[in-house]
């Protein structure tokens, strides 16, 4: 069923298709028809970052940047939904075209550039939430904010979303905001995370509620860089790490004209690279910090591979675009089967 709908949607411009699909999902949820599309996912609860997830398969950030559709997306069977990336001020993102599909490679390239309506819009949407599941909010910096002042943007977003999120993700790994990935390296990472950790404590004391903070990292790092990042995450008391974002590499799409487009590559071609990062990261962390695995999950086996490498939870994005809601159940079943076989 979904494959027929997908084939029709894929005839549209990718960004138009994206917006149309979300509008249709939103309408279905309002008309109480969303259950017809939902995956049948058995409850397989897992506790991570002090939160109880009904199943380990979540939706990665980027699909619902503004919090306009998470009620509908959350009704499809996901164990958790992450919205954003959001920035302090609204921004248009990069010029179009900026989203490209490569169906033959089950891949997507995007250079969206954190296009969003701003954190105040997202908070207003979340205040009206009907979705009762785990909601993550992914925060970033505005393109016009100098990298040396990035912490101010992250603090602004942290303060505004804290009371409305179940967990918060610090996105320092998108390749589409100039200079952003530099925050992952050297003293820059500590200088960013230390003030966020301090503010987390202030907000916890003020509101009486602890909201965990995860950091989303890139796949384009060698083992020594991964080890350095892991050390800082532990040193600064982060609660989790999401591995990984899109890659600037082009392995797997070299033969396609669209593969030459600038931006972050996601989907099947990033699967092995992200799994390798998870494995290396897990060795460095020694089980002291939970990992959420994302990148190239298209079935139960690839979801289980992420868990085998060290992930406690997984997220899907490109696989969800290509495979539809059935992927949620398949991924959850693959992970459950892996755990049963241990």
UniProtKB/Swiss-Prot annotation:
Main location: membrane
GO CC, alphabetical: cytoplasm; plasma membrane
GO biological process terms on file: 'de novo' pyrimidine nucleobase biosynthetic process; 'de novo' UMP biosynthetic process
Residues bound to substrate: 65, 110-114, 171, 176, 245-246
Keyword Nuclease annotated: no
Localisation: Cell membrane
Needed cofactors: FMN
Tagged with keyword ATP-binding: no
Pfam families attached to this UniProt entry: DHO_dh
Pathway linked to the protein: Pyrimidine metabolism; UMP biosynthesis via de novo pathway; orotate from (S)-dihydroorotate (quinone route): step 1/1
UniProt cross-references to CDD domains, sorted A to Z: DHOD_2_like
Domain of life of the source: Bacteria
Cofactor binding: number and manner: Binds 1 FMN per subunit.
Binding-site positions, FMN: 61-65, 85, 138, 171, 216, 244, 267, 296, 317-318
Subunit structure and binding partners: Monomer.
Its job: Catalyzes the conversion of dihydroorotate to orotate with quinone as electron acceptor.
Protein name, entry field: Dihydroorotate dehydrogenase (quinone)
Organism this protein belongs to: Cellvibrio japonicus (strain Ueda107) (Pseudomonas fluorescens subsp. cellulosa)
């Amino acid at each position: 069923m979904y494959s027929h709908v997908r084939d029709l949607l894929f005839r549209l411009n990718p960004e138009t298709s994206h917006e149309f699909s979300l509008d249709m999902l939103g309408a279905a949820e309002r008309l109480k028809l969303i259950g017809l599309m939902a995956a049948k996912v058995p409850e397989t609860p897992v506790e991570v970052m002090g939160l109880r997830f009904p199943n380990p398969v979540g939706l990665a950030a980027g699909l619902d940047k503004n919090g306009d559709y998470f009620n509908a997306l959350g009704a499809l069977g996901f164990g958790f939904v992450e919205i954003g990336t959001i920035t302090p001020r609204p921004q248009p993102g990069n010029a179009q075209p900026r989203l490209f599909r490569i169906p033959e490679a089950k891949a997507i390239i995007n250079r969206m550039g954190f296009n969003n309506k701003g954190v105040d819009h997202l908070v207003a949407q979340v205040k009206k939430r009907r979705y009762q599941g785990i909601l993550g909010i992914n925060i970033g910096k505005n393109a016009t904010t100098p990298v040396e002042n990035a912490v101010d943007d992250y603090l602004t977003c942290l303060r505004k979303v804290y009371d409305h999120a179940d967990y918060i993700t610090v996105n320092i790994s998108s390749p589409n905001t100039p200079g952003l990935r530099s925050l992952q390296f050297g003293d820059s990472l500590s200088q960013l995370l230390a003030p966020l950790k301090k503010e987390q404590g202030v907000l916890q004391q003020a509101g009486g509620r602890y909201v965990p903070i995860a950091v989303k990292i890139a796949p384009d790092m060698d083992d020594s860089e991964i080890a350095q990042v892991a050390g800082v995450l532990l040193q600064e008391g982060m609660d989790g790490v999401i591995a990984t974002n899109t890659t600037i590499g082009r392995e797997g799409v070299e033969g396609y004209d669209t593969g030459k487009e600038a931006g972050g590559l996601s989907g099947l071609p990033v699967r092995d690279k992200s799994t390798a990062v998870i494995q290396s990261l897990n060795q460095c962390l020694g089980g002291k910090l939970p990992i959420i695995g994302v990148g190239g999950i298209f079935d139960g086996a690839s979801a289980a591979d992420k868990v085998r490498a060290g992930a406690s939870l997984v997220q899907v994005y490109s696989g969800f675009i290509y495979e539809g809601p059935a992927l949620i159940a398949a991924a959850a079943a693959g992970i459950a089967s892996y755990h049963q076989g241990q």
